[in-house]
Amino acid sequence: MSVAELEAHEVALEAPTGGLWRDAFHRLVRNPAAILGAFLVSLFITAAVFAPLLAHGGPKTQHLILVAGGCCPGPSHAHWLGVDQLGRDVYTRILYGARFSLLIGVVSVSIGLSVGLVLGSIAGYVGGFVDSLIMRCMDVMLAIPGLLFAIGIVALLGPGLYQIMVAVGVVNIPIFARLLRGSILAQRENDFVLAARAVGVRRPVILFSHILPNAISPVIVQGTLAMATAIIDVAGLGFLGLGPQDPATPEWGTMLTDVNDYLQTAPWLAIVPGVAIVISVLGFNLIGDGLREALDPKLRGRTGRFRERSPFWFLGVGRRRALGGV
């Protein structure tokens, strides 16, 4: 190796890195799947935030339209996605439905995240009997299917917007708790934690200043994936008749169950909210997968190969081949 090559190698070694989060952000923006997910989520958030400006009236405003030989007018210039069996504009209800889906998803994930962080931190760092007690309770909650658990909670509390938030939030608690506990256990015996203990740093300071910042990455990824799951759970509860009962609260799952009798004569009434659910869930899943690849050291560098070798990356086709058959 020549002197010039040695000097260039030394300069490359001495060049400072941008830090974990900055490097992860650069990897994330180079991931086309994550970019597509961010675009879909941006559409979802835009529809939710600016629904009053983009909608054609209110969500329960009825338009009396006479249709010969049919029940519901199809898409038209005045009503882009048609109207339902009660004369309500479907486009308007989809926009307002995005608002309520986003609200329920954010609140429910926040409930599960906050409680799960507390329980997971205590279980992972304290250990012993406290760890066993908390984890056995989490195991009992995880033994019940999530949607069935949410149905039981809503049946106990009664149908409604706030009840759904609580139900979906409780379902997410054991997921975040177990995830953070495992991440803390992996970080607890690292050298920097042992060094902090050796110099007499207090245990709460070690937990909040040294362990949690390094253990939070999987929780962030799970938070985006939990948003997708929350949207599905909310739609499922609404489809079963446990969603908001107020007609002014259009929820996508409730919109699906309201048009069961019109699937043959007006199929767009079910297709439109179904597509809205698919797009929003796909967006959050793609962002979550992109964050996982950006933050997980074991997956770094795979995004580029996956993009080059798989033309159907957004559907997950060709992943195993793109990763060398692993």
Regions found by a protein language model. Give the residues of each.
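Alpha-helical transmembrane segments of integral membrane proteins
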Residues: 85-306, 314-326
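Short acidic (Asp/Glu) and glycine-rich catalytic loops that position anionic groups and cofactors
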Residues: 3, 45, 236-239
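Transmembrane alpha-helical segments of polytopic membrane transport and secretion proteins
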Residues: 1-39, 288-326
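Hydrophobic alpha-helical transmembrane segments of membrane transport/permease proteins
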Residues: 47-86, 239-250
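Short, strongly hydrophobic transmembrane alpha-helices
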Residues: 34-52, 117, 278
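Cytoplasmic juxtamembrane interface segments
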Residues: 22-44, 200-221
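Generic hydrophobic alpha-helical segments
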Residues: 24-25, 80, 193, 259
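Structural signature of transmembrane alpha-helix termini at the membrane-water interface
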Residues: 25, 46-57, 122, 181, ...
